[in-house]
Design a protein with these regions (language model features):
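HIT superfamily nucleotide-processing domains
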Residues: 1-261
Length: 261
């Protein structure tokens, strides 16, 4: 695999901007965006579901459907309109979300009617390309490998924080899902707790190793009418299941086979 470089650039708000690429990034920065006021999201307890829900008032102020020439995720070029990445070019960039659902500035909220606590976590934005019109589907295998390396780097670094319990890289695709910027990008949420859906999956897996059951020849043949198995990379690494009762249309569940056997 080609060597990958990582540059850490300290922004004017004291946060780090990371540049990942096959070429070493030494470009001098241009004008930076004015530092934003720290937001303070918080968690509220939902008694009917017995789970924490995060609230962030700052989310209503996030950039929404700007003209292409004012895209905050494009490389900086117009000195009169700084962007999140103050460089003329980059391969992949990662930086803290200015309007996060979790952050280290979260404070306790005093409320006599509901149970609350700080929403201390980390939210990052991952910009896949400097090209405003790129999509993951159009990217080369080498660029996708770079993106996977970026996710892995951030996953390991974020999970090393003792306050972080779960790290989720994800991408919302389309305005129907709430996307307000069309530049190719995704996000990473580092949770201060394990989300209930994930916790349930862990409990189910620990109770019954269903992946091993499915991969057993006898069960595989009997389940053939219900499961379509697609091996990702190779059978010893991971497995993708198209289940008969998916949580979303066209959903695919990808499971690592590490520690399964």
């Amino acid at each position: 695999m080609k060597k990958i470089f990582k540059r850490t650039f300290l922004r004017n708000d004291g946060e780090d901007l990371y540049i990942f690429g096959y070429d070493e990034h030494n470009e001098a920065p241009l004008t930076q965006i004015k530092a934003s006021v720290n937001s303070s999201p918080h968690l509220r307890w939902n008694p009917s579901r017995q789970e924490w829900v995060t609230y962030s008032d700052a989310r209503k102020n996030r950039t929404s459907f700007p003209p292409k020439e004012y895209c905050p995720l494009c490389p900086a070029g117009n000195v009169n309109f700084p962007t999140e990445i103050p460089f003329k070019d980059f391969e992949i960039a990662v930086f803290p979300n200015r309007w996060p659902s979790f952050n280290s500035n979260s404070q306790s909220i005093i409320n006599d009617t509901i149970k609350t606590k700080p929403s201390k976590g980390i939210c990052e934005v991952v910009v896949y390309s400097a090209n405003h019109k790129d999509t993951v589907a159009d990217m080369s295998i080498e660029r996708i490998k770079l993106l996977l390396h970026t996710w892995t780097d951030r996953y390991k670094e974020l999970l090393a924080d003792k306050n972080i319990k779960y790290v989720l890289p994800f991408e919302n695709r389309g305005e129907e899902c709430g996307v307000t910027l069309h530049h190719p990008h995704g996000q990473i949420y580092a949770y201060p707790f394990i989300p209930p859906v994930i916790q349930k999956e862990v409990e189910v897996f620990n109770k019954n190793n269903f992946i091993l059951d499915i991969m057993t020849y006898e069960l595989l043949s009997s389940f053939s009418a219900f499961f379509k198995l697609v091996f990702v990379s190779s059978p010893e690494h991971s497995i993708t299941l198209s289940q008969p009762a998916p949580l979303a249309i066209f959903a695919r569940d990808v499971f690592s086979l590490v520690n399964v056997f």
